[in-house]
Every structure is written in C-alpha cells, then in structure tokens.
C-alpha cells in the first residue's frame, strides 16, 4: 500500500514539473520576440502603413503590393492602407510599396534575433548615411511616377550656341569689331597685324589676309581724309563768300 502511494506521488510530481517547464519555455519565447515584430519561433512580421496625400486608399490599394526583398515576401494593403507581412526571419530587408499610379521610396528594415525592429531610408548613393524612421513604417507617396521624359522646347539660345553658327558669326564679329578697337592710324600696329595674319595664312591658294587688312584700313583712312578735305573745302568757300 505504501509503495503504491509512493509511486502515485512520484508520477504526480513528474507531471507537475513537465507543466512548469513547458510554461517557462512559452514565456521565454513570447518575451524574446519583442515589440511590434512579435512572431512564432524565429519568424517575425513587418507592419506599416502606406499613405497617398489627398487620395483615398480605396482608389489605389487594389493595384498596389508590398514587396520585401524583391518578391521573396509579398504583402497586400488593407482598406485603410495598413499592411502586415508575416513569416519573416531575422535579417536586413528592403521594403517597397509598388503601385502603377504612385511612387514610394524604399525603406530598409533590420530585424534582430530578439525581434527588435529598426527602419531607415535606403540611400543608394551615400550608403554610409543613415536616416532613422519610426516603426511601424509610415510610407508616404512622393507623387506619380514619371515614365516619359519631357521633350525639350526650342529656343534662340540653342540656335546661337550651335557650333556651326558660332564658327560663322565669331570671325565676322572679329573682322567688324577689330578695326574699331585697334588704332589703325599707327603704322607699326598695322604692320604687326599684317605679319601675324600672314603667319596664319599658310595656304597660298587662299586670298592674302594682309592685302585685305590693308585695303580695309586704307579705305577707312581715305574716307576720313576725303570727309576732312570736303569739310575744309566747304569752310574755305564760305570764307571766300
């Protein structure tokens, strides 16, 4: 009789110890998952909300999807714009909201082994720059996507900056403005200009630039002298009268 009672109590104690161990294991798993990334075992969930300013969620959520690391994990949006992607192990993931009508910036989410979530912007240019984001995610649209490049409008600056036009206009401006800037009455200056232009004119089939410059300057000087003589003649005739 005593042996049976002892066996009964031993079995009862064994069952109670197993129940206590199972409750401790379940409590440790629930404490280790942590925060908003609660999951079963080593699996967690990413949750957030997508917003398009000035547009109701019902007008665009039907064609939108939530992608985690491409198409490794896919989630759907609820009627209020919120989403939850389940069964995600610990690691770093890029979360994107894909919509044909609106553009959303991707977000990187880091999940620790204890279930802690850290979110930040994805910067492909400056990878070392870290901009923290609140969690759960609040993903706001930056506007409609631009699938086409606008055609550039034609302007006068495009015509003037054309290399062919500049090649024709610049020499003309030089020949017109240079005689006005340089003192053509100085023979030494004229001689130096003729020599420099002859050095550039290496092809003998082309017209001589020095002759052109001499004719240009001589014609202007002759015009000045003729105008001066005509003025003196008129003044002399007036005095005689």
Curated annotation (Swiss-Prot):
Record-annotated membrane-spanning stretches: 159-179
Keyword Ion transport assigned: no
Single GO biological process annotation from the record: tail-anchored membrane protein insertion into ER membrane
Subcellular locations according to the entry: Endoplasmic reticulum membrane
Chief location of this protein within or outside the cell: endoplasmic reticulum
Annotated region described as Disordered, given as residue ranges: 217-241
Cytoplasmic topology ranges: 180-241
Signal peptide region: 1-22
Name used for this protein in its record: Endoplasmic reticulum membrane protein complex subunit 7
Organism: Bos taurus (Bovine)
């Amino acid at each position: 009789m005593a042996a049976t009672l002892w066996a009964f109590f031993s079995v009862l104690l064994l069952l109670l110890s197993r129940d206590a161990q199972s409750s401790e294991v379940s409590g440790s798993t629930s404490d280790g998952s942590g925060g908003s990334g609660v999951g079963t075992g080593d699996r967690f969930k990413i949750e957030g909300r997508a917003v398009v300013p000035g547009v109701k969620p019902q007008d665009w959520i039907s064609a939108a999807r939530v992608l985690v690391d491409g198409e490794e994990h896919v989630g759907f949006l609820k009627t209020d714009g919120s989403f939850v992607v389940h069964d995600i192990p610990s690691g770093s993931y890029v979360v994107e909201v894909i919509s044909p009508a609106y553009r959303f910036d991707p977000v990187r989410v880091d999940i620790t082994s204890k279930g802690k979530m850290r979110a930040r912007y994805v910067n492909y240019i400056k990878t070392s720059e870290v901009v923290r984001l609140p969690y759960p995610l609040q993903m706001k649209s930056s506007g409609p996507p631009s699938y086409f490049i606008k055609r550039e409008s034609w302007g006068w600056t495009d015509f003037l900056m054309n290399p062919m036009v500049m090649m024709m206009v610049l020499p003309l401006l030089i020949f017109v403005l240079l005689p006005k800037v340089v003192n053509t009455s100085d023979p030494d200056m004229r001689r130096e200009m003729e020599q420099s232009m002859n050095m550039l004119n290496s092809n003998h089939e082309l017209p001589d630039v020095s002759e052109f410059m001499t004719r240009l300057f001589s014609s202007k000087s002759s015009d000045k002298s003729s105008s001066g003589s005509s003025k003196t003649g008129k003044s002399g005739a007036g005095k005689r009268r």
